[in-house]
Swiss-Prot record:
Its EC number is 3.6.4.13. Belongs to the DEAD box helicase family. CshA subfamily. DEAD-box RNA helicase possibly involved in RNA degradation. Unwinds dsRNA in both 5'- and 3'-directions, has RNA-dependent ATPase activity. It comes from Streptococcus pneumoniae (strain ATCC BAA-255 / R6). This is DEAD-box ATP-dependent RNA helicase CshA.
């Protein structure tokens, strides 16, 4: 369906056309008419499907710009998502004259208060900062007509449930509420029951939770071999833009440093970075000044960056929903992408949990060899030399070196000179700088009937799952080769001893339901 068939005003349609959009995405096509009718909506769709426009366009349509009041509130999980949503809402509402402000932690609250006083029709913010402003009476909610919860599952995972409930309780009851989430855990459903009026459900089928445009692979690799395995794959694939996910802030810092040592243009983002640096890194990544962005799950929430071709899960995510969000960074706007997850041998059971959620089976991928990496880097160097020789600006400087060049040509053969140039351009695989990445414990192995080991049907933790993988691998190119033989008693005994020596606190209900055990820093 085209946007001009959705009963939107001429002002909005003009801005939509300027942005180059013609066809509405499925979530937009189904949500916009319901929202324009004033109905509450719960929308479930993967990231990158146009959720901001799905709630933003009908919200902008209802704004009365002649009234200097805050009429809509958008709650977002992270600073980055708040800024991006504010920018998109401002872009679409520009012709209509809608004022949109964003508020978030890590920036001066005084400046944000001043901006709110200067006028706003829509406010986009993170839960903590919104509550601060409400308590200071700098954010007045009495005229709110539309409340939007964006990436609701992420706000839940980040522990914002109480803050969200506190904010909702202060918004007028006769409001319209729009809730969007990539996944729909029970706590999110309870919000719908408690705070929404007969909401309409718009849902992307589970089989589409991860887009078909993303080829999903995994590599079974030991912890100490992950970094070299990943960088060789990058050498071979030569991704235009890649995001690498690490589980901790320390991991992000170490990976960023290591990638720079190996010659990649890389920067990292995590919660400890100040806001100015985070925005600078993201701007450089969007503009192509960086090849690789390294991030924690929290720091990457809601990133809307076009052109990401590869996602590397250096650490397997701690919950399956995070996997959906991670790979949603690629395969956007009709373009294909690739995700590669590195899995320690005793983390194999976690893949089935992810697959149960995404309804898509990951393919085993064979690691690239040292020689394949070296050959790829040489090809890149040769192409760069060819491009430079075709550049008239570069060739104009050649004559400055004419006398010295002729002297070298008299002493050495063209082949020797070419080999020397390549040796300066391409890192020798035998002399690559060493990179140390601190080892972290793999996710805890937890045998059960849900794919974490034992004898779960089709589970990856048991022998049958591996045998199926071996059969799938044959004839399918670069697939992972599994060791043959028993994975039974010896492994079970080791896991039994591991569990005995690493007793965990009692599991919460959500941990029992998902199978994932998340502990605070310092817990064994």
């Amino acid at each position: 369906m085209k946007f001009n068939e959705l009963n939107l005003s001429a002002d909005l349609l003009a801005e939509i056309e300027k942005a180059g959009f013609v066809e509405a995405s499925p979530i937009q096509e189904q949500t916009i008419p319901l929202a324009l009718e004033g109905k509450d909506v719960i929308g479930q769709a993967q990231t990158g499907t146009g959720k901001t426009a799905a709630f933003g366009l009908p919200t902008l349509e209802k704004i009365r710009t002649e009234e200097a009041t805050i009429q809509a509130l958008v709650i977002a999980p992270t600073r980055e998502l708040a800024v991006q949503s504010q920018e998109e809402l401002f872009r679409f509402g520009r012709s209509k004259g809608v004022k949109v402000r964003s508020v978030y932690g890590g920036s001066s609250i005084e400046k944000q208060i001043k901006a709110l006083k200067s006028g706003a029709h829509i406010v986009v913010g993170t839960p903590g900062r919104l509550l601060d402003l409400i308590k200071r009476k700098a954010l007045k909610l009495q005229d709110i007509e539309t409340l939007i919860l964006d990436e609701a599952d992420e706000m839940l995972n980040m522990g914002f449930l109480e803050d969200i409930e506190a904010i909702i309780s202060r918004v007028p009851e006769n409001r319209q509420t729009l809730l969007f989430s990539a996944t729909m855990p029970d706590a999110i459903k309870r919000i719908g029951v408690q705070f929404m009026k007969a909401p309409e459900h718009v849902k992307i089928a589970a089989k589409e939770l991860t887009t078909e445009l993303v080829d999903q692979y995994y590599i079974r690799v030991k912890e100490q071999e992950k970094f070299d395995t990943m960088t060789r794959l990058m050498d071979v694939a030569q991704p235009e833009l890649a995001i690498v996910f690490g589980r901790t802030k320390r991991r992000v810092d170490e990976l960023t440093r290591g990638l720079k040592i190996r010659g990649f243009r890389a920067e990292g983002i995590h919660g400890d970075l100040d806001q100015n640096k985070r925005l600078r890194v993201l701007r450089d990544f969007k503009n192509g000044n960086l090849d690789v962005l390294v991030a924690t799950d929290v720091a990457a929430r809601g990133l809307d960056i076009s052109g990401v071709t590869h996602v590397y899960n250096y650490d397997i995510p701690q919950d399956p929903e995070s996997y959906v969000h991670r790979i949603g960074r690629t395969g956007r706007a009709g373009k294909s992408g690739q995700s590669i997850t590195f899995v320690a041998p005793n983390e194999m059971g976690y893949l089935q949990i992810i697959e149960n959620l995404t309804k898509k089976r990951m393919k085993g991928l064979k690691p690239a060899s040292v020689e394949e990496s070296f050959q790829s880097k040489k090809q890149v160097a040769l192409k760069k030399i060819e491009r430079d020789f075709a550049d008239e600006t570069i060739r104009a400087n050649f004559e400055k070196f004419g006398k010295d060049a002729r002297k070298l040509a008299a002493e050495f053969t063209p082949e020797e000179l070419a080999m020397y140039i390549l040796s300066l351009t391409v890192q020798d695989p035998d002399s690559l700088p060493e990179v140390e990445i601190a080892r972290e414990k793999p996710l805890p192995f937890k045998p059960s009937g849900n794919g974490f080991g034992g004898k779960a049907k089709g589970g990856r933790g048991g022998r049958r799952g591996d045998d199926r993988r071996e059969r799938d691998r044959r004839g399918n190119g670069r697939r992972d080769e599994f060791k043959k033989g028993s994975r039974g008693n010896d492994r079970f005994d080791k896991e039994k001893r591991y569990r005995k020596d690493n007793k965990k606190p009692r599991n919460t209900l959500s941990e029992k339901q998902t199978g994932f055990v998340i502990r605070n820093k310092g817990d064994k």
